[in-house]
């Protein structure tokens, strides 16, 4: 995360953060089926700083003036581990979660659960185009979704 935050200061781009855990089956499926899709890879690399964030890992970084770490991290522990303070601060409780941040590192919103490339496409393009600023209700999102024409291949 720190690398993406540092890069934003020189070249502002939004951040796309994949929040996962070691034991999460849908997280592994997302890696295998969605994040290896050529359309997803190309689009994310062109428009976002991509971050993989272990929600139970021991990364340390500074976000918006606050230092984040996982003081309860135990190296080598298998299965569920204590959550990273950053994951808790974002109120991430389900995995996988994909979290979007704007060019100034402000949280936009998270998307939870496994998504196919075609299901993820609408969120990537909604965020990248800044349309999310106008789509402010579930009803508006349904209308946006109905009119959305995707281009990602399976």
Predicted region positions:
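A short, structure-level motif marking secondary-structure boundaries and short turns
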Residues: 25-26, 69
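Detector for the c-type heme attachment site
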Residues: 28-32
């Amino acid at each position: 995360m720190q690398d993406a935050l540092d890069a934003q200061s020189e070249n502002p781009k939004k951040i796309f953060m994949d929040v996962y855990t070691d034991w999460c089956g849908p997280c592994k499926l997302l890696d295998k089926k969605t994040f290896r899709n050529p359309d997803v890879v190309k689009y994310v690399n062109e428009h976002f700083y991509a971050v993989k964030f272990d929600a139970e890992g021991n990364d340390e970084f500074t976000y918006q003036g606050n230092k984040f770490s996982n003081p309860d991290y135990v190296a080598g522990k298998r299965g569920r581990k204590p959550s990273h303070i950053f994951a808790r601060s974002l109120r991430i409780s389900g995995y996988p979660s994909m979290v979007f941040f704007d060019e100034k590192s402000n949280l936009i919103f998270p998307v939870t659960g496994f998504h196919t490339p075609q299901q993820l496409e609408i969120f990537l393009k909604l965020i990248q185009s800044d349309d999310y600023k106008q789509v402010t209700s579930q009803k508006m999102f349904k209308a946006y979704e109905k009119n959305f024409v995707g281009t990602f291949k399976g």
